[in-house]
Amino acid sequence: MHNQYGSIFSITTWGESHGPAIGVVIDGCPAGLSLSPEDFLPAMARRRPGQLHTSPRQEPDLVTILSGVYQNKTTGTPISLLIENKDVSSSSYEHLQHCYRPGHAQFAYEGKYGFADNRGGGRASARETASRVAAGVIAKKILLSQGIETLAFLSGFGTLESKNYPKLSDSLIQQVHTSPFYTLLPQEEIQNLLLLNPDDSFGGVVSFITSPLPIGLGEPVFGKLPALLAAGMMSIPAAKGFEIGAGFSSSQMTGSAYLDAFIADESGVSLQSNRCGGALGGISIGQPLEGRVAFKPTSSIKKPCSSVLKDGTPIAYRTPNQGRHDPCVAIRAVAVVEAMLDLTLVDLLLQHRCTQL
């Protein structure tokens, strides 16, 4: 259950980290959208392991379109995408079958189901997010056709952090996409932290921004734009916090300091500031959407940690040297955050078209 996300534009992901393949089925995509396997390459490359300061697992992450596309056009029927797992190394996990890995979902999965696939995290692995990124490519194409641009970037790495939301532009997108860390932070400072802590891992923050959204995205009460975004973002493995606009810092403000004043000019009514993050009453108001997602440090580290065998015997657990893990999962989570943003916005955009005759 709960492998589906979205209402009108919905996705269902499937597969495990060390299975033969993972994939996603997209339902609700309008017909006539141009789509080819090459369209997936840039986004998949940003999430793909085996790059600088990410997991050394080598996965090409080539997307195969199985259905829903004919002559490079979507047909309006379900689109099925397949991504093969090419670099599986399950032997690294065989000796871990009898102990609990600190910080991993294995203990929870075994408690819930009575059985769990322990190879590389199974269904709980961040490998699953490759399917979301693939689906997000289709969502982004729809958004761009409606004049909506989106971007996610690494805004926090360990103690390094920037809370500013820059204005979205082509040059900003290019700057983020050409950075090895997908960030506006000083790259040499990130590299120094990694070099000084080779046996440890780091948490991070991923910010997301959009061009001004159409007024009306989001539904009252349980379908609010920030609420749906929070659900999508917090479903990403290792996500531990979400905020929109001023977020948690708004709790330390006075009303006079927080309120966004309305202004009007020849282009219409807008806000003087955007501490609300682009939504009032859970509905977009024509402003850019701005938010952040916090990610915990990767649990797989080379430093020893206390744990127990499944029979309760205490042990000193250490991640095996042959294991392949990210020093900071937030780096590759940039592409996933952007995908979840795109998937949420497309679904709400299509819902909004049903609001008025």
Swiss-Prot record:
- Cite the entry's keywords alphabetically: Amino-acid biosynthesis, Aromatic amino acid biosynthesis, FAD, Flavoprotein, FMN, Lyase, NADP
Top enzyme class, one word, equals: lyase
* Cofactor, how bound (note): Reduced FMN (FMNH(2)).
This protein's GO CC annotations: cytosol
Q: Which residues form a coiled coil?
A: none
GO molecular function terms noted in the UniProt entry: chorismate synthase activity; FMN binding
Give binding positions for NADP(+). Answer: R47
Q: Which family does it belong to?
A: Belongs to the chorismate synthase family.
Name under which the protein is recorded: Chorismate synthase
